Amino acid sequence: MIPKEEIMGIFEKYNKDEVTIVTVGSHTSLHILKGAKLEGFSTAVITTKDRAIPYKRFGVADKFIYVDQFSDISKEEIQQQLRDMNAIIVPHGSFIAYCGLDNVEDSFKVPMFGNRAILRWEAERDLEGQLLGESGLRIPKKYGGPDDIDGPVMVKFPGARGGRGYFPCSTVEEFWRKIAEFKAKGILTEDDVKKAHIEEYVVGANYCIHYFYSPLKDQVELMGIDRRYESSIDGLVRVPAKDQLELNVDPSYVITGNFPVVIRESLLPQVFDIGDKLSAKSKELVKPGMLGPFCLQSLCNDNLELVVFEMSARVDGGTNTFMNGSPYSCLYTGEPLSMGQRIAKEIKLALELGMIDKVLS
């Protein structure tokens, strides 16, 4: 892990009046960049030329850093270009996937918003399960391997893959049949299979809850809630049951979009409770904890219990549903507030208070 002191040494050489907020052109970059501009920051996007159109059309980026391929992000010449523009990187799922988690931890020497040490706790299922479990959250039962399957389960794989390759099954035979099918289609590799995470299939309504922890205020804020459009499952459920049987198609759970929702108000104390518990435990297990945006993906069962099955330790894709604010985020200021602008507000306040070390790593 790059020492915090080294990152802050780099930042100390910056022109603090010309800080540029930078991210990769994908995932949640539109509201990250727009939010930064609304708070008076210069912005830049890292992109390939064929993916630059949205950032030009929407006018969210002041500068463009072009790469031949997104994996070039970690190259030293790109890092130097970022440092030269006094960059603060806001990481999201695509940035981590393209740069590579090992590079983010050990060789990407550009100041980054949030705690880069916690990103591995999202990527590795055992660490994620430890953090969720020790936080005291209700989580699905975990199975040690396919031979332990004794009822409906969901099979998942590590990393920010947007649900690709996930599948439900009920028996060990069904597990291996679906593994073989996905491997034949090139969706899964043998290495993926070795890292398969098998958990209890919880029946309930899905709520992806977006939080922001402010280290400057020491407060967890509820920013918004969304649900996902997933292919092919959301298409299959529109097909009558008898026709589904005839189609004989195994559903996939690839996230293709998101839509905003609100949760019943009587559940909000539970929503804040699980966010507070995760934030507190993260400070113990991976100091300084969950800084800035994070997400808890949950299912609400018919007992009105929130079961948390996954977390994001950085800005989650579902925050795109409230680029102009959510029913919750607007309650803090009385004005529309996106997650991107909330991040920029924290950076701006940290600079004003001389506490920028509290939000960077």
Swiss-Prot record:
Known pathway: Purine metabolism; IMP biosynthesis via de novo pathway; 5-formamido-1-(5-phospho-D-ribosyl)imidazole-4-carboxamide from 5-amino-1-(5-phospho-D-ribosyl)imidazole-4-carboxamide (formate route): step 1/1
Enzyme class (EC, first level): ligase
Source species, domain of life: Archaea
Keyword Phosphoprotein: no
Pfam families in alphabetical order: DUF1246, DUF1297
Domain ATP-grasp: 116-348
Binding site for ATP: 146-208, 230
Family the entry assigns: Belongs to the phosphohexose mutase family.
Enzyme Commission code: 6.3.4.23
Stretches that traverse the bilayer: none
Cofactor binding, note field: Binds 1 Mg(2+) or Mn(2+) ion per subunit.
Chain sites annotated for binding 5-amino-1-(5-phospho-beta-D-ribosyl)imidazole-4-carboxamide: H27, S94, N258
Gene name of the record: purP
Source species: Methanococcus maripaludis (strain C5 / ATCC BAA-1333)
Alphabetized Gene3D superfamilies for the sequence: 3.40.50.20, ATP-grasp fold, A domain, ATP-grasp fold, B domain
Function: Catalyzes the ATP- and formate-dependent formylation of 5-aminoimidazole-4-carboxamide-1-beta-d-ribofuranosyl 5'-monophosphate (AICAR) to 5-formaminoimidazole-4-carboxamide-1-beta-d-ribofuranosyl 5'-monophosphate (FAICAR) in the absence of folates.
Binding-site residues, Mg(2+): Q297, E310
A biological-process GO annotation: 'de novo' IMP biosynthetic process
Keyword set includes Magnesium: yes
Keyword annotations: ATP-binding, Ligase, Magnesium, Manganese, Metal-binding, Nucleotide-binding, Purine biosynthesis
Gene Ontology terms for molecular function: ATP binding; ligase activity, forming carbon-nitrogen bonds; magnesium ion binding
Names of the cofactor(s): Mg(2+); Mn(2+)
Record field: catalytic activity: 5-amino-1-(5-phospho-beta-D-ribosyl)imidazole-4-carboxamide + formate + ATP = 5-formamido-1-(5-phospho-D-ribosyl)imidazole-4-carboxamide + ADP + phosphate
Name by which UniProt lists this protein: 5-formaminoimidazole-4-carboxamide-1-(beta)-D-ribofuranosyl 5'-monophosphate synthetase
